[in-house]
Amino acid sequence: VPGATIALIARPEFKSVQELRGKTVGINAFGGALESAARLMVKHFGIDPDKEIKLLATGPMESRFAAMKQGLTAATLGSPPTDFLGKKFGFVVLARAHELFSFPVSGLIASVKKIKERPDEIKRVIKAGIKSNRYFIQNREGTIQIMTEWMKIDREMATATYESVLKAFSDDLSLPENGLRLLIEEAKRAAKVEREVAMNEVADLSILREAQRELGIAQR
């Protein structure tokens, strides 16, 4: 998934991301995907994440919503079905990360040793991932049914979740270079790493390209 399926959810009096300037935004914990998404999303709208908003770790989704109800925070972030549940509480979705920029927070990870010793196994997993993503994109009803059974949620929530994340999925598992670079820079910031980190230090897309060719997918 080349884009983060994370939504910025606010109390109803806030009509735009810009209105969060000077406010407190709740996240689950520091050092994770929600903190990164919060920083990148407000920055996209011209807000300095270091000076013009305050991030507050308020725990799991239920606690984050409680903090908003109590007026301790103006907004929070979360992946579906957080946006669906937030709307049920009367909150509003101001922005979705995958609609603003590429920021891959999920993918296939393997050690260098594994890549060298078992490339065919990795390629099979990648092909399965491509096929599953294509099923997800092309088969709405089948996917929603699977979600109700696997996630143990009702159809309304499954449908809302599907619609929220659909555009974030890639039909060939391609990873945009700008998204990977953004991910690296954010990881460097969190880990306080100052040296340059080349993309080939953290990503090997050669097996993905091979899998795409074997499936007849044109290179982008």
List the model feature ranges, each with a label.
Residues 14, 47, 153, 192-193, ...:
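Helix N-cap/coil-helix junction residues
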Residues 188-220:
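Conserved C-terminal helix/tail region of periplasmic/extracytoplasmic solute-binding proteins
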Residues 60-151:
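Pocket-lining segment of extracytoplasmic ligand-binding domains
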Residues 41, 85, 146-147, 186-187, ...:
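Residues within well-ordered alpha helices
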Residues 19, 25, 99, 120, ...:
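Short capping/connector residues at structural and topological boundaries
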Residues 1-60, 64-67, 74-80, 92-97, ...:
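Short, glycine-/small- and polar/acidic-enriched structural segments
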Residues 117-195:
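Secondary-structure end/capping motifs
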Residues 54-56, 160-166, 197-209:
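Short linear loop/turn motifs
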